[in-house]
Amino acid sequence: MFFRILALLPLVFLVTAHSLVSRSDVVVPVCNAISNMNTTAIALQNACTNFEAQPTNDMAMPIMKFGFALEGEISSGINVCPSDVLSSGDTEILFNALKDLYDTIQKLVSSILKLKDAIIAAGYEAQSCFAVEMMATSMTTFMDKVYACSANEYKGPLDEMRSGVLTMMAQANFSYCGTVSPRGSSKISGVEI
């Protein structure tokens, strides 16, 4: 009887160890999506910088192009974000990837807010409102999904990051569209302006 129990120990160890190991097959697609969002957000920020230097219709077009591309990247991130709770190791990897995106989004929203009058003067008020609404809605959904799948020990820092991103998106949406959320309320996922 004793030897039968000993024979089962390696199996129990392997099953337990497997559940504790990071599942890179789950987190890599999300990190790739975050990397793509970051790259596209930087391209959008560069387009904003170019438009600021030369506010013409030709320079406004890349802003629209990269704005819609960023919304597409965010949607891809929503699609690959797992619904199961990640391990601590996977959540740490995800959190580190999100820190870079957070910094980029801060700079991007600052640029977008600064250019509002010039973009409206170029005749892109309706398109800008639509693009910002789509981005705010998608980013809210993405951050909510990331928060939901994260390990408990990262919930605090992720909630701060999520609130920061949602506040930035709400500010941009309010600036361009006059409402905080696409449905006209003064809230985006619990964040008020």
From Swiss-Prot:
Positions of glycan attachment: N38, N173
Main location: secreted
Signal sequence, renumbered to the chain: 1-17
Keywords from the UniProt entry: Cell wall, Glycoprotein, Secreted, Signal
Keyword Transcription (UniProt): no
Modification(s) after translation: Galactomannoprotein, glycosylated.
Induction: Shows high expression in fruiting bodies and is highly expressed throughout development.
A GO cellular component entry from the record: extracellular region
Subcellular location(s) of the protein: Secreted, Cell wall
Family according to the record: Belongs to the cell wall mannoprotein 1 family.
Function statement: Constitutive protein of the cell wall.
Miscellaneous section: Armillaria species are both devastating forest pathogens and some of the largest and oldest terrestrial organisms on Earth. They forage for hosts and achieve immense colony sizes via rhizomorphs, root-like multicellular structures of clonal dispersal. An A.ostoyae colony, known as the 'humongous fungus' in the Malheur National Forest in the Strawberry Mountains of eastern Oregon, was found to be the largest fungal colony in the world, spanning an area of 9.1 square kilometers. This organism is estimated to be some 8,000 years old and may weigh as much as 35,000 tons.
Name used for this protein in its record: Cell wall galactomannoprotein
